[in-house]
């Protein structure tokens, strides 16, 4: 995790190699970048994930964080194989312009690959990784464009969660009624 005040000291956020974050950095809002994490497969989707989200909610409340963001990954870099889920994210979950990072121009991979009326929504959502689904359930968005990370064999998308726009029902679930 990297708060905006710490990023200023470091000179940048980690995900700036992949995404132009100027719209977030100039927003005047308190930011928190979430880095890559991995939870052992035996604990994914269970109580461990709930406790991680709950601890994060406490940190967000303690530091008055307004916008959380970070990179999440699909396995693989074959864009054609990811066309449905990427297109679904672009068409249904694109961040509002005032908080929408964009993949760096020199590495920009469009996510708008399939016309919206040709997307198999069920199949596309099944292909979306659980972490991305969790952000979407909370009211999260994706930035514009993806980044093909050949070193890690992933296709990365930028996730953005504006705490003021969070889904109230799921906010209560993940925060145990913490004041977010």
List the predicted regions and their residue ranges:
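Long, continuous compositionally biased terminal/linker segments
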Residues: 158-180
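Acyl-donor binding region in acyl/amide transferases
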Residues: 3-141, 146-155, 159, 166
């Amino acid at each position: 995790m990297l708060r905006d005040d710490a990023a200023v000291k470091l000179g940048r956020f980690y995900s700036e190699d992949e995404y132009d974050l100027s719209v977030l950095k100039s927003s005047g809002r308190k930011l928190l970048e979430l880095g890559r994490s991995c939870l052992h497969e035996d604990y994914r989707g269970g109580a461990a994930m709930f406790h991680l989200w709950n601890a994060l909610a406490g940190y967000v409340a303690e530091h008055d964080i307004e916008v959380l963001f970070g990179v999440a990954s699909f396995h693989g870099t074959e864009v054609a194989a990811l066309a449905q889920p990427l297109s679904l994210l672009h068409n249904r979950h694109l961040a509002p312009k005032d908080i929408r990072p964009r993949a760096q121009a020199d590495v920009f991979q469009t996510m708008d690959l399939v016309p919206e009326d040709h997307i198999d929504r069920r199949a596309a959502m099944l292909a979306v990784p659980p972490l991305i689904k969790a952000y979407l359930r909370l009211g999260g968005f994706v930035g514009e464009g993806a980044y093909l990370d050949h070193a890690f064999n992933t296709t990365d998308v930028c996730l953005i969660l504006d705490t003021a726009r969070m889904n109230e029902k799921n906010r209560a679930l993940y925060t145990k009624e913490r004041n977010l």
